[in-house]
Amino acid sequence: MKKIAMLTAAMMMLGASSVLAAPINQMAEPETAVGVGTKESYIEHKITNKATIGYQYADRDEYGDHKDAYLQYDVVGSEVKLIGGYRWTDGKDNAFGGVALSTPRVMGFDAYASYVAGKDFNETQVGINKNLLLNVDLNANYHNFKPDHGHHENGVGAGITVKF
């Protein structure tokens, strides 16, 4: 199973993408996205044609929950983004930074990948979004969460995003 997930992740990265635990969304100003996934929920809003602010709540198997406030800044179109934010957990709060890449939408699909790191963790996610309706996307992803102390958490997830 791990080999299949890693092969899928590598193929999607060759297609060129990156992300935070919430999927990377391509939005227009002033669009808002609300999403629910296997272990997370989030809301984000495109405040300018280059900047998106967001808030995410995620439930970790071993480490309790964490809450993220973040900013994504489009560097090259909406395909390359810089990410910065702050994560609140049970006792280990962290500033973090990273990068996200996403592919242009083709036949209703766009792929993405991201990497973020803080003082006590790093996290990678690769995934694909499929447009189901005009403003509803289905998301499938693989994530790898590595705290500096403790066990790694990785797995496959799915979610729904509504944009308005």
List PLM regions with ranges.
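Outer-membrane beta-barrel proteins
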Residues: 2-164
